[in-house]
Amino acid sequence: MFDKIELSVSPYDTAWVAMIPSLNSVQAPFFPECTKWIVDNQLSDGSWGLPHHHPLLIKDTLSSTLACVLALKKWGVGETLVNKGLQFIELNSTSLNDEKQHTPIGFDIIFPAMLEHAKELALNLPLKSDVIDAMLHRRDVDLKSGSGGSNTEGRKAYLAYIAEGIGKFQDWEMVMKYQRKNGSLFNSPSTTAAAFSHLRNADCLQYLQSVLQKYGNAVPTIYPLDVYSRLLMVDILERLGIDRHFRKEIKLVLEETYRYWLQGNEEIFLDCITCAMAFRILRVNGYDVSSDVFTQFTEDHFFDSLGGYLKDTRTVLELYRASQILYPDEPLLEKQNSWTNHFLEKCLSSGSSYADGPRECITEVVHNALNCPYYADLERLTNRRSIENYNVDETRILKASYRCLNTGNQHFLKLAVEDFNLCQLIHQEELQQLGRWVVEKRLNKLKFARQKLGYCYFSAAATLFAPELSDARLSWAKNGVLTTVVDDFFDVGGSVEELINLIQLIEKWDVDESTHFCSEQVEIIFSALRSTISEIGDKAFTWQGRKVTSHVIKIWLDLLKSMLTETLWTKSKSIPTLDEYMINGYVSFALGPIVLPALFLVGPKLTEEDVRDPELHDLFKAMGTCGRLLNDWRGFQRESKEGKLNAVSLHMIQGNGGVNEEEAIRKIKGLINSQRSELLRLVLREKNSNIPRACKDLFWKMIKVLHLFYLKDDGFTSNEMISTANAVITEPVAFHGP
């Protein structure tokens, strides 16, 4: 599956290779096998191109068909095929100037050049004069001016890339500056064929021969594409949610890619989109890769390159995705995130950029990327979107269209649908089980408490979705429900006496329940806490092979004591410093009982040294701080009315009147960004890290949940979350296969 990358062959590029004359005679082809392939591969409608092509890719088919017709005419073979090809061109000639049609790169220059070549071959083309005149006019405008100016490096690269359309007027010395170590120009057989025809460069020939050796008697429109295609397969498997079924294969791809990265391989570093994808996937998987590589792809440099000149949407999209894998003190990625975000937003609004496929498909991908940033995109939501938008027959287009059979894989889609729906059935059973648990623990009798079981379970199912993680999901969801209950109890439901009573009961743990409760509320909450903590401890023993219940108790005690501190501040109208508030606040935000016990339930064994490792504390603190600040930013107005302490209001108070609300919020948002990037660094780093990656991932998963909940407002009150949760838990995804 990963070993052999299968690209569709390109009639267009094959035709240009076929038109190379022999070294011995200009009357004979250098590669007669390519001419034979053209003879053998005309489609039933008289065209050459990909079968079942998209209705908006007629220009591409016309370009390929004319190139093949020229090759046959040049060598005086296939007269019947030539006539059928000309008939196809005549019947579809209105598409040549149709602006709704997708235009291949360089089409407005290359196609008119082929028309002139047809005249030289005394080939009578059945095109109306107004069609030809319109094309020649566009060609002349493009050649004389160019949208980016005639002297930019991007413009030069563009003219070099479409060298076959410039012909004898080309500056071939300039073109050869783009020759790669493999002998090609831009990894393009058609460009390389044109260069070899004019210059007889030995390295160009060696490249063409190597491609034909691999593909037989035809060539693809781009070669090699192995590194990019394998990375794209990894990306697709992750987005479909089935990467866990291919861990060995993915590991081999990552190791090979990292080796190429360290070697400075051209296939990565001369191709912006491959470089960006390699950086993102390697960094996310724990490999040590520096963002310094993007120095060559800064905004100015990018727009002075071929991709920038073309305003290539997919490449900018990949740069944008890479920029989100951001560590602290990486200004290069911060700037990259800013300009790529701006470019993509403009792309959506104007549609003026280049897309290497039907625009509606690219638009959907860009829209999702902008609305679902990496730090707010829950895995199961990504999986569902990717399944629903997966195109088995995805066609991309450069100078000619192509497909990669490895990435357009029907089996991937079928497995993803089955996996999603199987997991969903398990999730539905667990949610019903949790509903019974709420009733059994009498939590529904606590009138002051918000009932948020659906949200709590959704956050677990959307991130810890694999069947084998059931214990972790249930722990996550139950503790989510209990932290909500306790939060409401400390906020509005309980007196100070009750709060202290609850804490004392947890501290004593083994108590005579009939004599130590000062209210029924305390009895219900304590009983639910004790039974749930004990249950989690028992399950953790199965995973860990040792007792960890005492750790779970301490996690809860830390939370309860921090909540009591906030309650006492409020009741005494004390105003802590911002530092005092945050030191207490990252604990009182109540993520500890949700995330920390789950660490014992996801697979890796954690030693006592691991549990006490400062790294674990740093992960928790960064997550809790980020969450607290998100809550305080989004909940500022509501909490101010309720008289609650808040990081925004404390920042304004400490400013002694010199800091207004807008400035305070800007400061808080900056702190959120820095804490989030620090957490990501801690999660992804492999060096000097003792905590297993599967455990560290839980902290990042929670950050994603929080950012999704707080993307617009206080997420617990957002009606949109209901449909989002249903998409993960209740609505199966459909398979649209053959």
UniProtKB/Swiss-Prot annotation:
CDD domains: Terpene_cyclase_plant_C1. A motif (DDXXD motif) lies at residues 487-491. SUPFAM superfamilies: Terpenoid cyclases/Protein prenyltransferases, Terpenoid synthases. Its cofactor is Mg(2+). One of its GO terms (biological process) is gibberellin biosynthetic process. Its EC number is 4.2.3.19. Binds 3 Mg(2+) ions per subunit. Mg(2+) 3 binds at residues 631-632, 639. Belongs to the terpene synthase family. The Asp-Asp-Xaa-Xaa-Asp/Glu (DDXXD/E) motif is important for the catalytic activity, presumably through binding to Mg(2+). PANTHER family: ENT-COPALYL DIPHOSPHATE SYNTHASE, CHLOROPLASTIC, ENT-KAUR-16-ENE SYNTHASE, CHLOROPLASTIC. This is Ent-kaurene synthase-like 1. It comes from Ricinus communis (Castor bean). The lineage of its organism: Eukaryota, Viridiplantae, Streptophyta, Embryophyta, Tracheophyta. The gene is KS1.
